[in-house]
């Protein structure tokens, strides 16, 4: 059994998040997704570094996942896996599904350089496969990949040629900059308007 673990800031979730979830559903038996605080974020909230509260981000991600589940029921939210430390999330997944499954940790290309600074990274990396998605504005440096390998990591790069259409060149940060509603799913757009988020 192959299980993908996808903790995301979801600040807000975009059509790129939707595309990633669909790709994962097509390649894994189970996709576990949750909204998480990223300790490296530098947003306006001094406590979390994010733009929207964790509660709002969880609600928006739930709306996105409910939309994806119409076609891919194996994509499910597991908020109890959420932790600022990926190793803790993995350990909680192992408590839920056991040690037998092959676990993959889903990350964006923007995180590759940060991973070596993560909590207990030498324990984390040998226990999972990293599935790395391209991100607009972030190249993938072979030296950074080599460093991951030295730390015991093994990874899969989502093909940036054949799969480019699967991950559109948009991101939460691009949405926050230009406020283009075409970048986010309709249910998320309605929630943002209702809650008056991202107005600054």
UniProtKB/Swiss-Prot annotation:
Keyword Transmembrane helix part of the UniProt annotation: no
Keyword NAD: yes
A molecular function (GO) term: nicotinate-nucleotide adenylyltransferase activity
Keywords from the named record: ATP-binding, NAD, Nucleotide-binding, Nucleotidyltransferase, Pyridine nucleotide biosynthesis, Transferase
Pathway noted in the entry: Cofactor biosynthesis; NAD(+) biosynthesis; deamido-NAD(+) from nicotinate D-ribonucleotide: step 1/1
InterPro entries, alphabetized: Cyt_trans-like, NadD/NMNAT, Rossmann-like_a/b/a_fold
EC number: 2.7.7.18
Pfam families hit by this protein: CTP_transf_like
GO biological process, one term: NAD biosynthetic process
Catalytic activity from the UniProt record: nicotinate beta-D-ribonucleotide + ATP + H(+) = deamido-NAD(+) + diphosphate
Top class in the EC scheme: transferase
Stated role: Catalyzes the reversible adenylation of nicotinate mononucleotide (NaMN) to nicotinic acid adenine dinucleotide (NaAD).
Annotated HAMAP family: NaMN_adenylyltr (MF_00244)
PANTHER family: NICOTINATE-NUCLEOTIDE ADENYLYLTRANSFERASE-RELATED, PHOSPHOPANTETHEINE ADENYLYLTRANSFERASE
Family: Belongs to the NadD family.
Name used for this protein in its record: Probable nicotinate-nucleotide adenylyltransferase
């Amino acid at each position: 059994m192959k299980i993908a673990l996808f903790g995301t800031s979801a600040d807000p979730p975009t059509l790129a998040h939707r595309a990633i979830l669909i790709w994962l559903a097509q390649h894994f038996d189970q996709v576990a997704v949750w909204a998480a605080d990223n300790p490296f974020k530098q947003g306006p909230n001094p406590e979390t570094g994010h733009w929207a509260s964790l509660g709002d981000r969880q609600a928006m991600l739930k709306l996105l996942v409910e939309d994806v589940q119409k076609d891919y029921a194996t994509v499910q939210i597991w908020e109890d896996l959420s932790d600022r430390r990926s190793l803790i999330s993995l350990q909680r997944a192992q408590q839920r599904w056991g040690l037998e499954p092959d676990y993959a940790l889903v990350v964006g290309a923007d995180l590759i350089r940060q991973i070596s600074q993560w909590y207990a990274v030498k324990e984390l990396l040998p226990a999972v496969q990293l599935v790395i998605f391209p991100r607009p504005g972030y190249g993938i440096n072979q030296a950074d990949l080599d460093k991951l390998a030295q730390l015991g990591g093994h990874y899969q790069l989502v093909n940036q040629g054949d799969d480019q259409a699967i991950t559109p060149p948009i991101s939460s940060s691009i949405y926050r900059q230009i406020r283009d509603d075409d970048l986010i799913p309709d249910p998320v757009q309605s929630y943002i308007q209702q809650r008056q988020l991202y107005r600054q």
